[in-house]
Regions:
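Stable alpha-helical elements in mature extracytoplasmic
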Residues: 63-70, 74, 139-146, 167, ...
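Active-site neighborhood of HAD-like aspartate-dependent phosphohydrolases
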Residues: 82-89, 98-137, 152
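Non-catalytic pre-domain segments flanking phosphatase-related domains
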Residues: 2-4, 24-92
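Short, acidic loop-to-helix structural element flanking the phosphoryl-transfer center
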Residues: 130-158, 165-166
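Structured segments of extracytoplasmic/periplasmic soluble domains
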Residues: 73, 77-84, 97, 101, ...
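C-terminal cap/substrate-recognition subdomain and adjoining C-terminal extension
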Residues: 30-34, 40-41, 45, 61, ...
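Bacterial N-terminal signal peptides
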Residues: 10-21
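Short hydrophobic beta-strand that contains or immediately precedes a catalytic carboxylate
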Residues: 91-93, 159, 220
Length: 246
């Protein structure tokens, strides 16, 4: 019995020894188990990063260079097409097309603050309506050159803006002060009128200009909604990563 028990004990010990994992096996099992492939994150760009990138784009000169590219193309088209049409016309937006609002954009940290005063620039906040009434928006020089080029070729220039009619005097004064003189008309949103989008107002105005006998050979704006809806032979979209108008 004693021998038998010893044999059995030896068998058990041998079995246990064979069953225990080796040091190599233990080391392998200590490695982290790879997780299943996770789907790509779908979050949009970080707002703070986007604002920093937009500021760098403006201040580095890239914005100005891109403006020059688009306006040069517009000018070349007007020179080519203008003499071929009996009553050629150019349509221009105002805000961040003919005049720059960068001072307000920066002061408001890219917010779109419509109401309130604007009396602390370069600090904010600055209400856009109050800013428009100041009539101090600087010119966008490349657009002014296109305007002057068009006028030298007897191309009629029409401004169509989302600004309300109540800002007409300040807007006309601002345009005149920076060099936009001799345009055919300034179309503004009637008081107490709401449009679902900028295009809902601007496209019908362009259609009315055509009904008056003009051929709109070019339309230029900084928002896709400035150009949507047709009634222009060639649209020219200026860069604007700073805000979006539907």
């Amino acid at each position: 019995m004693i021998v038998l028990n010893r044999l059995r004990l030896g068998t058990v010990v041998a079995f246990v020894a064979l069953s225990l994992p080796s040091a190599h096996t233990l080391a392998q099992s200590a490695q982290p188990i790879p997780s299943p492939s996770a789907p790509a994150l779908r979050q949009p760009p970080n707002v703070g990063d986007a604002k920093a990138a937009a500021t760098a784009y403006h201040d580095s000169g890239e914005y100005g260079r891109d403006l020059a590219v688009v306006t040069s193309e517009a000018g070349a088209w007007i020179v080519q097409r203008g003499p071929q049409v009996s009553r050629p016309a150019l349509v221009l937006d105002i805000d961040d097309t003919a005049l720059t609002n960068w001072e307000v954009i920066k002061a408001d940290d890219f917010g779109r603050i419509i109401g309130g005063p604007c009396d602390a620039l370069p600090d904010g906040p600055c209400g856009w309506a109050a800013w428009d009434l100041l009539g101090k928006a600087p010119v966008i020089e490349p657009t002014l050159r296109v305007f002057q080029q068009a006028r030298s070729l007897n191309v009629a220039v029409f401004f169509i803006t989302g600004r309300p009619e109540s800002q007409r005097l300040a807007t006309e004064q601002n345009l005149r002060n920076v060099g936009y003189e001799g345009y055919a008309a300034l179309h503004m949103v009637p008081e107490a009128t709401h449009y679902a989008s900028a295009a809902a107002f601007k496209a019908p105005v362009r259609a009315a200009i055509e009904r008056d006998g003009y051929t709109i050979i070019a339309s230029m704006g900084d928002q896709p909604s400035d150009l949507a809806g047709g009634h222009a032979e060639q649209p020219f979209l200026l860069p604007n990563p700073f805000y979006r108008i539907p």
